[in-house]
């Protein structure tokens, strides 16, 4: 449902320092443009105070968290996720049917995050943005995702056509096969 933006920000295991540095001003600009927002932002422990102070002073509804083992709670509260481009998180978002903007870590091994972002974007599962373009393009990309209902519906439609259920069944079969071989 897109009458307001409930944005989940995930930065991977390192919580993406740049997300905590660059995103708050973009979120303030969203609020100032009269888009109703709530931010759920993963950050590092040493960023909690600064982010909390900023969001409070900007009167932005927010929840800051560090590592959590229950990310599903945040998925259920969100209608847009801004994340790094690890295969696991992008796969989870597709299976949870949540539109996303993936921002690949430019220093990832063999540039795998960039390749993941391109793959998922070409499939029509979400948008991607290079880290160097955050300041210039992220605000507009969020606004277009919010305003262009057909784009959002397209992402969700494409995500619905994808399922990893077969993967889990195959994984279960392989585990059982290995266990049976050992017995």
In which residue ranges do the predicted regions lie?
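C-terminal alpha-helical cap of glycosyltransferases
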Residues: 164-183
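A short, well-ordered alpha-helix in the C-terminal region of glycosyltransferases
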Residues: 151-165
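Donor-nucleotide binding loops and adjacent catalytic segments primarily
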Residues: 1-80, 114-117, 129-138
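Acidic, glycine-centered active-site loop in nucleotide-sugar glycosyltransferases
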Residues: 97, 114-126
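Acidic donor-binding loop of glycosyltransferase active sites
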Residues: 60, 76-91, 98-99
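C-terminal "capping" alpha-helix adjacent to the active site of nucleotide-linked donor transferases
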Residues: 123, 127-150
């Amino acid at each position: 449902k897109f009458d307001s933006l409930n944005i989940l920000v995930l930065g991977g295991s390192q919580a993406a320092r740049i997300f905590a540095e660059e995103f708050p001003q973009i979120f303030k600009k969203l609020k100032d443009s009269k888009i109703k927002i709530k931010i759920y932002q993963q950050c590092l422990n040493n960023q909690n105070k600064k982010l909390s102070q900023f969001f409070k002073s900007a009167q932005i509804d927010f929840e800051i968290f560090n590592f959590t083992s229950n990310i599903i709670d945040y998925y259920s509260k969100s209608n847009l996720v801004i994340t790094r481009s690890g295969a696991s998180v992008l796969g989870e978002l597709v299976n949870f049917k949540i539109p996303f903007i993936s921002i690949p870590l430019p220093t990832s091994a063999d540039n795998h995050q960039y390749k993941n972002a391109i793959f998922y974007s070409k499939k029509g599962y979400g948008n991607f943005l290079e880290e160097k373009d955050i300041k210039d393009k992220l605000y507009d990309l969020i606004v277009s995702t919010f305003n262009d209902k057909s784009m959002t519906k397209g992402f969700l439609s494409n995500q619905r056509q994808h399922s990893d259920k077969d993967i889990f069944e195959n994984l279960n079969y392989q585990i059982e096969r290995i266990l049976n071989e050992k017995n």
